[in-house]
Amino acid sequence: MVLSIESMLRTKDDVYQPGLPAKPGEHYGALVRFVEQHAGNSILDLGCGYGAYSLALAARDRQCIGGDINLAYLTKAAASGLPVVSIGPVLPFADGSFDSVILLEVIEHVPQIEAILKEAFRVARRNVLITVPNSENLELLQQNDVTYGHMLSSDHVHFFDPDSLKTLLGRFSNAVEIHRGDPIYPFWFVSRSPAYYGLRVLYRLGLLKTHFYSRLYAVASVREN
């Protein structure tokens, strides 16, 4: 798709392993806050995995349904109390069935990416919310033999920077907002020491600037007919 796997990552079988979905109660708070800020009340969670994010949102009074192609994942999500549906190339919902559709850390794993996006925008009334790993600085990081931890999944088939993600979503939406998030602070070597906390305060105050962001957050509005 956008950036080739070969040009971005070293593919070693003993390092890169398939990623697993978050378990209930182990969701990443920034993703939940992102959805809370932008989503409507009714939400379809595509690629829901074990349902960690839908369950967290349901606890915040959102009406969520989880969809996935993996029946084992859906079984665990349903056992946790999440309404679920097995999905295929065509989603089993009428046009505009949900206020929002979310795909959190999903589309980088999907070979037929445009097909699932077409369906996501079809069943959404308001918007489609997407998060993906940010690939814009991977080559620079690779030169120093490092990468973001969540890039170590062997089942990533697409890699996005802000421009390529906006171009892709622009095929389905006239209003796309892309934000970089989850900054990487270059002081891992002093982790949890007094220096670590002091440097972190300086970054939060804006006195020091970070140049690396590990995730992209996208809000794409549904086109009006």
Where are these regions (language model features)?
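Conserved N-terminal segment of class I S-adenosyl-L-methionine
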Residues: M1-A94, S100, L104, L117, ...
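A structural helix-start
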Residues: P24, L71, V110-P111, E136
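Short N-terminal helix/helix-N-cap motif within the alpha/beta-hydrolase-1
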Residues: P111-A115, L140
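Conserved class I S-adenosyl-L-methionine
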Residues: L129-H156
